[in-house]
């Protein structure tokens, strides 16, 4: 059937348009680059010309001859017959990681672990006095001359005829020189002050103290039985509350004995106080 005169077949015109597109051209330039020209028909029916200029750069690198030889090997398995180089469907290309072995890597890791463990222990450690169990250093304890460290036993008095006594100037065991003021005292030293030295035997240890107690409260209670020279209430450094024990010192031991008798079992802050003489050093 012939086509009526004056009627246009758009499908045939599209075919003719596609067939009429020029072929791709490649032109080599003097500088070594290539100019590639292509033609296409867009969705709007218009023709578009695309010109690309490509310059190839050859980079030469020096590699190990063995590596270069392995690259020339014939591929096998799923890669058989494929060109040189990695194929995306069978090979996963990732970043090259440089591996540098270390001789003592295991020992270094263990040392780092030990250091971290020690730091954690020191971070959680708290200062604790060996004498009164307070949160301060033992050397700064106000009762270091009154009480002995917990677990220590006071040395026995040495007889007058023992080696290293006041009659000689040598030490008891090592044969070293002992100053005159230390002879006869087992190396403990002589306290200065003479008759003005305080009587540390008049110190009371008060336990089961309320955590809300204050030093002034204890001073007011114990001052009824004599002259109180000092009061020490152990407190927690973080919370500021009492830790449950305190020390009260009197100027006279008689007053301390009277206070110990009266205050032992005394109710304070919904708790029963336990009062006793502090152990001597």
From Swiss-Prot:
Pfam families: eIF3g (PF12353), RRM_1 (PF00076). InterPro entries: eIF3_g (IPR017334), eIF3g_N (IPR024675), eIF3G_RRM (IPR034240), Nucleotide-bd_a/b_plait_sf (IPR012677), RBD_domain_sf (IPR035979), RRM_dom (IPR000504). SUPFAM superfamilies: RNA-binding domain, RBD. One of its GO terms (cellular component) is multi-eIF complex. GO terms for molecular function: RNA binding; translation initiation factor activity. One of its GO terms (biological process) is translation reinitiation. Residues 202-280 form the RRM domain. The keyword Cytoplasm applies. It is found in: Cytoplasm. Keywords: Cytoplasm, Initiation factor, Protein biosynthesis, RNA-binding. Residues 1-32 are annotated as: Disordered. Belongs to the eIF-3 subunit G family. Component of the eukaryotic translation initiation factor 3 (eIF-3) complex. RNA-binding component of the eukaryotic translation initiation factor 3 (eIF-3) complex, which is involved in protein synthesis of a specialized repertoire of mRNAs and, together with other initiation factors, stimulates binding of mRNA and methionyl-tRNAi to the 40S ribosome. The eIF-3 complex specifically targets and initiates translation of a subset of mRNAs involved in cell proliferation. This subunit can bind 18S rRNA. This is Eukaryotic translation initiation factor 3 subunit G.
